[in-house]
Amino acid sequence: YTYTHELGIQGMQKNLGLSDEQIVRKNNVDDTDALATQKAIQECIDEGCNIIFGTSWGYMDVMEQMAEEYPDIYFCHGTGYKSNGKNFTNYFGRIYQARYLSGIVAGMNTKTNKIGYVAAQDSSNSEVTGGIDAFAMGIASVNPDAEVYVKITHSWYAPEAEKAASLQLLDMGCDVMAQHCDTPYPQTTAQDAGVYGIGYNSDMRKETPDACLCSVIWNWSAYYTSEVQSIIDGTYDGKNYYGGMAEGLVDITDLADFCADGTQ
């Protein structure tokens, strides 16, 4: 997840011709620690930043408060739902579109009709549940006999829990492994077991060339470029952003050569 946002910032920087000195990064800021979040944002402001992107859900409330305190600075929060229509907006994407397509791929390549899904959060998180629903709908459109089995880690980044969840799903007979979590363990575990995987966030063929049927991917540079450009040229309108495949924000990778005949 963080890696794809970093690629997005790099893409924006290249597209707009910005120098390295114009980009300030604050990494590993605990989104459950409001003081740490506030400190990181304040440091950005003190270093002269006038556009601040926060990529984690937990930054939302602090960004909302600081947007009120600094009305001349643009605050853009990823994955959240709060905004003020002025200098505080939220952004995300129609990832369900790509999830649906990846479900079609999974449904056409399972032999056991059992498909595993390692999820970072439970049903209280609409981002995760919406992705599962879209994935399941894609599966059902081509293989109504297949079922999706979900294991929850209760953390966006929990390597050991993700590995354990993957092994549990394999023990249940799942032969395609999808995920909404931050490590490649569901994919590497699938490859080690000789079954297929559906990657997420970035192209996971790099880690699992023998298992990855396709990956659901983000191209965050599509958003970062358009948002920063709008501020530069004066067309910024304070609206929230919710792009999809049409905007080039979400997609799936090319299909693996070993996908079942007819997968398209």
Residue map of PLM features:
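A residue-level marker of the well-folded mature domains of exported/periplasmic proteins
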Residues: 1-264
